[in-house]
Amino acid sequence: CPFGPEGFSDWGTGFEQVEIGMLGVHWAPELVEELNRLSARPGVHFVWLTSWEDMAPKYLCHAIGLEGRHWPVLRYSEQKGTREWWKLEAIQRDISRHRPGRAVWIDDQLGFEESALAWMAFLGRGILGISPDPRRGIARADILRVEAFLDG
């Protein structure tokens, strides 16, 4: 939860907290377990697309037990600035490069980025976008949607 938790997680426990540098990070351990399980699925390729950039695999993974130290990092500095939102350009370039049959994009800002929503609508069934509430984080229902999408 990037802005601190609000209430309880829907994962069956309260949020855990750890300080990483100057940032307090809140997370649900069950969510981390599910992300680790999903990332180990054959054919599934996770990438980091976060303003944390290299700090995510370097510090966040160790702090919360996420097995994402070796996931590729899409960086702001590698974008050409052709889009209003650098993350949209980054994911477009990554998808063009790797050509996955399906893609899932989870970002708490996603629901507020009209150009990203329009691009995903254009792609249609090939992409699933999830924009979790930043005060609740990724919910159990979000993970179920991801699994159904990947299995579909």
Each language-model region and where it sits:
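Alpha-helical substrate-recognition element adjacent to the catalytic core
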Residues: 1-84
